[in-house]
Amino acid sequence: MINPTTKDLISSARKDVHIDLSKSELSRFNIVHPLDLITLPHNALPEMDFDDVDTSCEFLNKELSFPFMITGMTGGTPRGNRLNLAFAEVANQCGVAFGVGSQRSSIANGKSQKELRKLAPKIPIIGNIGGIQLAQENGLELAKAAIEDLEADALAIHLNPLQEIIQPEGESNWSGVLNSIEIAVKTLPCPILIKEVGAGISLPVAKKLHNVGVYYIDVACAGGTSWARIEAERLPKSQRELYEPFLDWGHLITDILPEMRQILQQI
């Protein structure tokens, strides 16, 4: 059984603050998103019937209407859970995958999210816990509880060292996370997906993950919402200035995707 700690109670309160801050322009990366700079070539002679275009695909043994996933963002509070219920319902209607935000708080506080599976029976649902939490004493127990509660098709392990180091209550001991991921891959009853939260996953890190059996990676590069900026807004101004160089820190998707082709046949 996972019992709530003071950290879990603080985490619940923090999640609502995150929701409020994420609606502010101050939470956005101060960069031009690299995908906005890409122009796709126009084909004036397609030589095909558009009615033959089929965007459907299979992901985690379930069919999607097109390759798209609403990735994990929030949860663990009544407001966060209402958002997840809305996301799950829309994802099921559209036939796309859906992932929840970190489940640590909801599990520790005995707040089940089973309703999500009832709303979204047809699509892949991805659970979520942090890499640091996985490496702690009850990490595997937490992971199993997260999977069971959602009847999850996969479990995302999020890697967020930049966010944690800026977060006032953040945890900084990342020792043993890779080993814990390897154990999770070998022992948990569903696939493991590794995701960043906005700073990206480099090729060397992706290779380490692949070497321990990970086949699903969400690189989650810089652009859009910045968790570094959200956490910095919660700090006193004097401390915020200390982290100024890291507020737009992160790999660009246009740099990372070509690199990932080196191991694309394996993941």
Language model features by range: what are they?
Residues 52-60, 84-87, 109-117, 142-146:
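Short, charged beta->alpha transition segments
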Residues 58-109:
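Active-site cofactor/substrate anionic-group-binding motifs, chiefly glycine-
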Residues 88-93, 121-125, 131-267:
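Alpha/beta enzyme core
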Residues 51, 79-83, 107-111, 138, ...:
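Short secondary-structure boundary/capping elements
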Residues 1-60, 64:
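An N-cap/entry alpha-helix motif that binds or orients negatively charged groups
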Residues 93-131:
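A gly/proline- and charged-residue-enriched helix-loop-helix capping module
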Residues 17, 27-35, 59-61, 85-91, ...:
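A broad, low-specificity signal for short, low-complexity segments enriched in glycine/proline
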Residues 41, 58, 71, 126-128:
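Residues in well-ordered beta-strands of folded domains
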